[in-house]
């Protein structure tokens, strides 16, 4: 029962945007950028950061589901550790959205539910498949973050600092999943994941 309550609390905090970072926000070492971005740039950056926030909501759901279905205690611990770092990402993105006078996606409950279902299915397929799913997810997120970094205005050092740290963490999570025995996913599954990601990013940018 304690585990259920804890996991349910984590889900509510992820959806509501009430998470707290266990690490310092990478943007805190930079000065505020009030007035440095044009209005159109602020809107675009807000859209990008909303997409990244949704990605972290989904990461919480995926890791939570895969943690609950893990057979091996070491795998469960690895999922929990990664989820805590992803929670940092969630808090950083939420803070940046507030700085930009914007908001998270209105569809966060839907994104969370869908990601949890996918993570549960991956976890039920076995630890090696589940770890392989983590590795592929983190690889695609790494590519996605690199694309967003290319789109950031030169004056937006705060968003850049956040996304660069997030990308470093995602690379490390993917490497750890492969090292723990994650198996490569079939090409059709990888393609399906990319397609689902495109739907999410397109909708979350606006809604």
From Swiss-Prot:
Pfam families, per the entry: COQ7
Keyword Cell membrane: yes
Cellular component annotations (GO), alphabetically ordered: plasma membrane
Positions of Fe cation 2 binding: 86, 138, 170, 173
Cofactor remark from the record: Binds 2 iron ions per subunit.
Topology in membrane: Peripheral membrane protein
Binding annotation for Fe cation 1: 56, 86, 89, 170
Top-level taxon: Bacteria
GO BP term, pick one: ubiquinone biosynthetic process
UniProt GO MF annotations: 3-demethoxyubiquinol 3-hydroxylase activity; metal ion binding
Listed pathway(s): Cofactor biosynthesis; ubiquinone biosynthesis
EC number of the protein: 1.14.99.60
Compartment(s) of residence: Cell membrane
Keywords tagged on the record: Cell membrane, Iron, Membrane, Metal-binding, Monooxygenase, Oxidoreductase, Ubiquinone biosynthesis
Co-factor(s): Fe cation
Family matches, as SUPFAM superfamilies: Ferritin-like (SSF47240)
Keyword Phosphoprotein in annotation: no
Reaction(s) the record says it catalyses: a 5-methoxy-2-methyl-3-(all-trans-polyprenyl)benzene-1,4-diol + AH2 + O2 = a 3-demethylubiquinol + A + H2O
Coiled coil: none
Family: Belongs to the COQ7 family.
PANTHER family linked to this entry: 5-DEMETHOXYUBIQUINONE HYDROXYLASE, MITOCHONDRIAL, COENZYME Q10 BIOSYNTHESIS PROTEIN 7
HAMAP family: COQ7
Name of the molecule in the record: 3-demethoxyubiquinol 3-hydroxylase
Organism of derivation: Cupriavidus pinatubonensis (strain JMP 134 / LMG 1197)
């Amino acid at each position: 029962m304690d585990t259920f309550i804890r996991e349910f609390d984590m889900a509510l905090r992820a959806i509501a945007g009430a998470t707290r970072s266990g690490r310092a926000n990478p943007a805190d070492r930079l000065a505020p950028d009030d007035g440095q971005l044009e209005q159109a740039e602020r809107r675009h950056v807000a859209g990008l950061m909303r997409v990244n926030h949704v990605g972290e909501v989904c990461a919480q759901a995926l890791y939570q589901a895969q943690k609950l279905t893990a057979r091996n205690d070491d795998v469960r611990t690895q999922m929990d550790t990664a989820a805590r770092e992803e929670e940092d990402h969630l808090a950083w993105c939420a803070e940046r959205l507030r700085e930009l006078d914007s908001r998270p996606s209105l569809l966060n409950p839907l994104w969370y539910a869908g990601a949890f279902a996918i993570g549960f299915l991956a976890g039920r397929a076995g630890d090696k498949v589940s770890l392989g799913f983590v590795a592929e997810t983190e690889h695609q997120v790494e590519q996605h973050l690199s694309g967003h970094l290319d789109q950031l205005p030169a004056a937006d050092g705060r968003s850049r600092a956040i996304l660069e740290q997030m990308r470093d963490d995602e690379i490390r999570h993917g490497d750890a999943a492969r090292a723990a025995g994650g198996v490569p996913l079939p090409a059709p599954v990888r393609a399906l994941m990319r397609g689902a990601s495109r739907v999410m990013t397109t909708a979350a940018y606006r809604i």
